[in-house]
Amino acid sequence: NGYLWEKINEISLMNNCLIDFTHSRQAAVIDQISYHGDLLISGQWGDVLFDNPGINPSANLENQVKFIITKIVKPGGYELASKLWSHWDMEGRFENELSEKFKNYLLDIQISNPISKVRAFKSIHWANRWANEGLKIFTSRNEMFIPYYSDEICEFICTVPEKYLADRKIQIEYIKRKSP
């Protein structure tokens, strides 16, 4: 309902326009929550670590690449990028270059399980490029702690069988036991 228009310049300076901030929930609440303490604790990345990304557990590399692309490329994105690629007279086809880039990213991740590999891909590439930008709104006002970014949590996730991570089972069970 227009809450961002008064803050659009401030938000663009915070996130450098690297993400879509026209519907940023963070901007709607930052002024209210920043007065409740000096440290904000974020649950960001819990959804990635404690759930199945939805890829077939037996997906081959080609299907993993296709899966990643469907998660990243927005509607109309291929068309726009392909037209710009052609307009700029770049070699090859955009679709092929993008697929090859993601294939190489996935090959760099030395994990055989497709579900874990996609989770690692998102943690390595997605968080840095998209998810972290939204946090800049919070860190502009307060110090922030993100427990799911800790090495200990990531190492723990690597030891948990997928059946407990899927559908956030382990997370939900923990909440039930600690906050009945």
Give names to the regions the model predicted.
Residues N1-S112, E133-K178:
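ATP-dependent adenylate-handling active sites, centered on carboxylate activation for C-N bond formation
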Residues R119-E133:
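Core structural elements
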